[in-house]
Structures are given as C-alpha cells and as structure tokens.
Amino acid sequence: MTNPEVRLRTFQAENNIYTKGPLSLVIQFTRLVRERTFPLNPDDFQTSSKGQVAGLGGGNLKKILKEHGITQQLSAEGGRTSRGSMGLMIKYVDFLNEWNTEETVDFAVVEDFWAEQVREYFRNQPFILTADTSKTIGANLDELFEQARKRQRQNPGTQYLGTVLQHLVAANI
C-alpha cells in the first residue's frame, strides 16, 4: 500500500500538473467522481461533441476552492477549454481505476492534496514591479509592497514583505 501523497505527487510530476488548467481539471474531477462506482469510464465524462470534459466550469471550481479557503480565481473556464484536458482526464481516470484496484481511494484526501497544490501555485506566482514613469520610484515600490502584503494575508505565518525588503536592500548594497 503506497502513501496517497506519494501516489499523487508521482502522478502530478508524470503529467506536469502544476499550472492553472491541469490543476483546475484534477480538483474538479476529483469532486465529480467521488460518489461514482468503479471502474470509471472516461467516455462518461466527455461532452456530446467529445471535445471537452463534462462537468468542469469556473463556477464549480470557485465553489470547490472556496470550501478549501482559497479565494483567488484559478481559472475563469475551470479547465474546461484547456488544451490537453481531455487527455489528462483519461490518464486521471486510469490512475484512479488502478489505485482503486489496490485500495479504496479516499477522495477527501485526494481533494485536499490538489487544494494544497493550488495554494502552492498561488504562492509561487512572481511579484511584479512596474516601472511606470508617471509615478515616483516610491509609488512604484509601494505597489510592489502591497502585492507582498496581500500575499502575506493570503498565507498566514509567512513574511513576504520582509523578504521583498531584504532583497531590495541587498540589491542596493
């Protein structure tokens, strides 16, 4: 019996699930299939045109993320229109089916894992310093500091503002 986090991290790495579209798909799809009986059939999750994964959408994604305390918008379309979503969905179905043959999949654990990956995605977004010549250097830096404060509020216990200030001081020395 393999640790669920190890399984999920392996699947994540093998399928490059680190960006908005793939993360949107897997967290919503996990919610979509948690009450289904195994084995899952990928054909059951395709739209009638076979071009998109059925059941995905921005509103649904927002609701799931909110339940996990995530208020930022990951994706307006919820991964529904992302290129590669269909292929990833099929791989995810195969992954879940294989896992289920070995042990019962705990979808609460799986969904929590993907929610944490979404948090990680937001934590890793770069800060943007604009060089707006109509503003003073101080005003431009204030915008950067506000980004750091906002990120710090979204991730309690972190010190983004202090880190940004340390980097600016070190860059000036």
Residue spans for each PLM region:
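Acidic-basic catalytic patches of nuclease active cores, encompassing PD-(D/E)XK
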Residues: 147-173
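Interfaces and regulatory segments of ATP-dependent nucleotide/adenylate/phosphodiester-chemistry enzymes
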Residues: 2-156
